Amino acid sequence: MRVVKIGGSVISMLENLWRENGISEILGNSVIVHGGSRHVDELSRKMGVKIEKLTSPSGVTFRRTTKEVLKVYVAAMIRANKEIVEFLRNQGINAIGLTGLDRELIIGERKKLIKAVINGRVVAIRDDYSGVIKKVNTQILREYLKIGTPVIASIAYDPIENTPLNVDGDKVAYHVALAMDAKELYFLSDTAFMAGGKVVSELPADEIEKYLIFAKGGMKKKLLMAKEAINSGIKNVVIEGLNGRTVIY
């Protein structure tokens, strides 16, 4: 089986990707995980909720997830989920809208402490509602697979603190793929991996380290996860962009 991660930046482009990139077979025979960055930004503006963007000591940019922001995040992700499910159903796919909260599908743990660089100083933040993934309930997910195509919004549930969590969509897809023994992990993004201004169409996992100098932010994270995925038994990792496709093996 295959796990597909739909990036938040391409949700609005699904119709074009369906028509021009031939993703119908990919989306119809998979477990789908999605992000929703655009929806979060739009809803926060409408609700007048300011989202603070911080940078970790390693240079990664992230949203600070306060309790107020968490409410926006959950609502926005559910909106994104409905948009994807509606699109897929219009294409004849029996899509099933889910979040990690449903039947405790994705179990997470709130990060008790995160670090950010603010005004040149490393600051500890203890009231954030982002989390790490601890478990994927594969039994429940297999039940949904018997009747349709699961579409999972990237929200996890922390049973100890009884709270939803903001979790990284790429990491949700990665953990679902490992837990379900998927053969392929497929990232549907706005761009394939590029080096020297050109799309890298094929990339052996054992050469990824040499290419990291060309990757930043989310792409660097995808490449490192791809290497871990291949080493864990996943056959292929694909990064499908509007400009081409990178296959990592």
Swiss-Prot record:
One GO CC annotation: cytoplasm
E.C. code: 2.7.2.17, 2.7.2.19
This protein's UniProt keywords: Amino-acid biosynthesis, Arginine biosynthesis, ATP-binding, Cytoplasm, Kinase, Lysine biosynthesis, Nucleotide-binding, Transferase
Reactions mediated catalytically: [amino-group carrier protein]-C-terminal-N-(1,4-dicarboxybutan-1-yl)-L-glutamine + ATP = [amino-group carrier protein]-C-terminal-N-(1-carboxy-5-phosphooxy-5-oxopentan-1-yl)-L-glutamine + ADP; [amino-group carrier protein]-C-terminal-gamma-(L-glutamyl)-L-glutamate + ATP = [amino-group carrier protein]-C-terminal-gamma-(5-phospho-L-glutamyl)-L-glutamate + ADP
Site label Transition state stabilizer, positions: K5, K222
Cross-referenced InterPro entries: AceGlu_kinase-like_sf, AcgluKinase_fam, Asp/Glu/Uridylate_kinase, LysZ
Subcellular location: Cytoplasm
GO biological process: arginine biosynthetic process via ornithine; L-arginine biosynthetic process; lysine biosynthetic process via aminoadipic acid
Glycoprotein as UniProt keyword: no
Residues binding substrate: R63, N166
GO MF annotation terms: acetylglutamate kinase activity; ATP binding; N2-acetyl-L-aminoadipate kinase activity
Pfam families with a match to the protein in the record: AA_kinase
Annotated Gene3D superfamilies: Acetylglutamate kinase-like
Pathway linked to the protein: Amino-acid biosynthesis; L-lysine biosynthesis via AAA pathway; L-lysine from L-alpha-aminoadipate (Thermus route): step 2/5; Amino-acid biosynthesis; L-arginine biosynthesis
Protein purpose: Involved in both the arginine and lysine biosynthetic pathways. Phosphorylates the LysW-bound precursors glutamate (for arginine biosynthesis), respectively alpha-aminoadipate (for lysine biosynthesis).
Family indicated by similarity: Belongs to the acetylglutamate kinase family. LysZ subfamily.
NCBIfam families according to UniProt: argB (TIGR00761), PRK14058.1-2 (NF010660)
Protein name per UniProt: Putative [LysW]-aminoadipate/[LysW]-glutamate kinase
Lineage, uppermost ranks: Archaea, Methanobacteriati, Methanobacteriota, Thermococci, Thermococcales
